UniProtKB/Swiss-Prot annotation:
The chain crosses the membrane at residues 1-21, 31-51, 54-74, 81-101. It is found in: Cell inner membrane. Forms a complex with MdtI. It comes from Salmonella agona (strain SL483). GO terms for molecular function: amino-acid betaine transmembrane transporter activity; antiporter activity; choline transmembrane transporter activity; spermidine transmembrane transporter activity. This is Spermidine export protein MdtJ.
Length: 120
């Protein structure tokens, strides 16, 4: 469970970092760029710890997919970016992919011990 929390933190900091990049690009201050640098750095640190126990493909797909989903939603809400029918279809496909990836994730089973063999 701890590693899933780390993955959630990686996703949240990625979203914050990417949104602050946009905020800095439309504003006049450097605070947005500094916030972006800190958040993206933290995101990769959290992700690197999360993949110790979560399969890399699953962690990366969830990190990137959920990040794209929320970045798009917040971009529409905060920066008045357009949300076309094609973007909505893409986001729905993305959500379906995230669900499929997560549902296909299983905990590894316990290793099976080999029977003792006599050596000759």
């Amino acid at each position: 469970m701890f590693y899933w929390i780390l993955l959630a933190l990686a996703i949240a900091t990625e979203i914050t970092g990417t949104l602050s990049m946009k905020w800095a690009s439309v504003g006049n201050g450097n605070a947005g760029f500094i916030l972006m640098l800190v958040m993206i750095t933290l995101s990769y640190i959290f992700l690197s710890f999360a993949v110790k126990k979560i399969a890399l493909g699953v962690a990366y797909a969830l990190w990137e997919g959920i990040g794209i989903l929320f970045i798009t939603i917040f971009s529409v809400l905060l920066f008045d970016e357009a949300l076309s029918t094609m973007k909505i279809a893409g986001l729905l496909t993305l959500v379906a992919g995230i669900v499929l990836i997560k549902s296909g994730t299983r905990k590894p089973g316990k290793p099976v011990k080999e029977a003792a063999r006599a050596t000759i």
